[in-house]
Amino acid sequence: LEQIGQHPEQGWKKTEGYDPIQKAFIESGSIQCGYCTPAMILAARALLRQNPNPSEAQVREALSGILCRCTAYVKPVQAVLKAAADIRNSGQTLSEDETYPKAYEPDMVAVHTLPETETIGKSEIKVDAAKLAQGKPAFTADLQLPGTLIAKVLRSPYAHAKIVRIDSSKAKALPGVAAVMTWEDLPRVVYSTAGQSDPIPGPLDMFSLDNKVRFVGDRVAFVAAETAEIAEKALSLIDVTYEPLPVIVDPRDAMKAGAARIHDEPEYVNFADSNPAINLAAKIRIDIGDVEKGFAEADRIFEQEYVVPKVQQAHIEPHVTLTYWDEDDRLVIRTSTQVPFHVRRQMAPVLGLPIKRIRVIKPRIGGGFGNKQEVLIE
């Protein structure tokens, strides 16, 4: 893996067409987000070199070390079994330096040349499946610009605390550090992280940095440095004094009179009957029809309190953002988001820029499942 580097496709020989494994992944619909596809193809290649006729269990074992969130491994396993059969039927074997003729390339015809009903009732190949099967650059982190700084975030060890004092002088003096930012260095602009349509669903309860932390892992300071190692070292040099505040972990306790307020900032903007005085994020009631009459006529009435825990979508690609100024003095935000236009609209007031001076580019994302509808690191 160290020899292959960031792009796993470098582990096989480049050809004009596609080898049988790539072809099987493309034609079987095995490629979803594509973030894990090159690694799966390399694992399949290693398996089929040793065992040209594997069982399904052997294929699953070969792919088991590769994390995949999208496919549940169903289609990739089918693709490897199909590739194995195709190779056996062709009389070929996999070798270290195999090349395959153009004939292995699946038929792809430009859409504008097709009759109107040509595709009805037929399976179509994913438009960027070939690119992903070849492991070509497709994701945010695949673009590496010269002179790029690495940003790291100092996070809170406390669930609820005030920042009484923060000293970043040692971090700023570290060679290779370009910038250190704390809440004292940034405009205090309230916003929502929810990437939804205007008007922005609230509550507006976030700041780029604040002098109060509200959960373990909340943002305390930013560092930009020449390398990730320097940035991490700089974070360790930031001296923070916290005043711990009462921690509330049960929503019932949070809504009791006299409970510590999580959001006591005056800039807080209400949404959906939220009530920061009792730590209520939202209150939503939906009535359909005559509710009172329905209860009065019901034979049975069931009342229950339902608790819905937060679920992590577990996409394989993390949140990644690359920003730079282009030749027209526009801020370009290249980011792994599902909502580029919402990012653009919400970033403008936070950065104090006209929206026309912000351009958001959304490359292929390595899974999101709704989690990348939130503006978190941009």
Q: How should each PLM-predicted stretch be described?
A:
Residues R261-L351:
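Helix-loop-helix junctions that connect adjacent transmembrane helices in secondary transporters/permeases
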Residues E2-G5, F25, G29, L48-P52, ...:
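Structural signal for hydrophobic packing residues in well-ordered secondary-structure cores
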Residues M40, R49, V153-E184, A221-T241, ...:
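Alpha-helical support elements that line or immediately flank enzyme active sites
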Residues A85-N275, I301:
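Flexible, low-hydrophobicity surface segments
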Residues Q32, L67, T140-D142, S169, ...:
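A generic local secondary-structure boundary/capping motif
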